[in-house]
């Protein structure tokens, strides 16, 4: 099995891995009106790392103070949707599942590290070394150009 460091394992275990629970909660809230919660968090431009320089320019902060939006801003749908996304029933359900460690799977966490953990040798139709050994002459001598590998040939 692939080795994972404790820090990396802890970080990846904290990530939401249970897609079934997220899908079920999102489907249930998708039928309700008004749409207050979704699995995708609402976008807040003032908290976006890539838009930080725009909001720190010399023109924008006075405008934000004038419109009373200089306290971190809200998402497109307003503060109620932001509040319900953080403290609503759907998010509380997902938070409780993740705090308890539900939905954590070692195969999902190890990801690509787990892919080559237990390889078995593959012997194809032409043997261990592939197509270069499929004629009697090549089975007797390796190549007229010499060997280019340090692995055993026969």
Swiss-Prot record:
Pfam family of the protein (one): SPMAP1-like
Signal peptide positions (record): none
Protein name as annotated: Sperm microtubule associated protein 1
Species this chain originates from: Homo sapiens
Encoding gene (name): SPMAP1
